[in-house]
């Protein structure tokens, strides 16, 4: 298990973190919105007054990002790019920005993290609860199409130089969205908020009484949400990853 404090969480699976009791201050009462995107339950909680419209806008942003960043939804920008047979595709600014960040982190990780992993990860069919174990021939073929170097960005145009390559932003999108939501909340003069994207937990400030949020780290394989430890944060992020969830 890894616990990190960072702005953009780079993990294939982000889960296992949650707010323990005592996260809310005595006043004002927190207001939350929940939406499911990227196969993840996203909860945004704001502790400032008059935040209903702001939360509605946050939900709309999540749905918009999902519509553009999903690689499995036909009509999304990433789906269009992955099915362009190597032809250049014009994308929105946010999508290009996220791809560029993904390429940069892939470079910094020397390919150990790579946003073009989709041809390989698809072989396991992780969305299927039973899973699939591919044979070595299929694995080697898929690996030949992985390489962030095959992503070419020119302005708002992105091209996959290998027609068989495919981008999967699942390892970086949630952290990126959390950062964007935090930036929006700050623009709206929100001072106290908690953003939970499937275990990628980001705090804006602290609680209304200026104390820390107490973020629980789920015990691996526990079925009842039992916490193995907790982390106190203020204006930081906590991201956990492990092998016990998809």
Language-model features and meaning:
Residues 2-246:
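Mature catalytic core of soluble alpha/beta enzymes
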């Amino acid at each position: 298990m890894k616990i990190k404090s960072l702005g953009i969480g780079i993990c294939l699976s982000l889960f296992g973190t949650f707010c323990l009791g005592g996260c809310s201050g005595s006043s004002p009462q927190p207001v939350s919105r929940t939406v499911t995107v990227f196969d993840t339950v996203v909860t945004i909680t704001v502790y400032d007054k008059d935040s209903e419209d702001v939360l509605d806008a946050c939900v709309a942003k999540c749905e918009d990002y999902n519509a553009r960043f999903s690689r499995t939804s036909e009509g999304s920008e990433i789906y269009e790019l992955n099915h362009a047979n190597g032809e250049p595709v014009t994308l929105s600014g946010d999508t290009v920005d996220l791809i560029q960040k993904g390429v940069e982190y892939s470079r910094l990780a020397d390919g150990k993290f790579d946003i073009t992993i989709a041809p390989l990860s698809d072989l396991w069919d992780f969305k299927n609860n039973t899973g699939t174990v591919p044979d070595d021939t299929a694995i080697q073929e898929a690996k030949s199409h992985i390489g962030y170097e095959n992503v070419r960005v020119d302005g708002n145009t992105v091209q996959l130089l290998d027609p068989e390559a495919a981008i999967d932003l699942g390892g970086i999108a949630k952290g990126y969205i959390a950062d964007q939501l935090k930036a929006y909340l700050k623009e709206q003069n929100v001072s106290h908020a908690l953003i939970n994207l499937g275990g990628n937990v980001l705090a804006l400030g602290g609680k209304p009484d200026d104390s820390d949020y107490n973020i629980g780290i789920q015990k691996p394989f526990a079925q009842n949400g039992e916490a193995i430890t907790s982390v106190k944060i203020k204006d930081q992020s906590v991201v956990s990853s492990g092998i016990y969830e998809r």
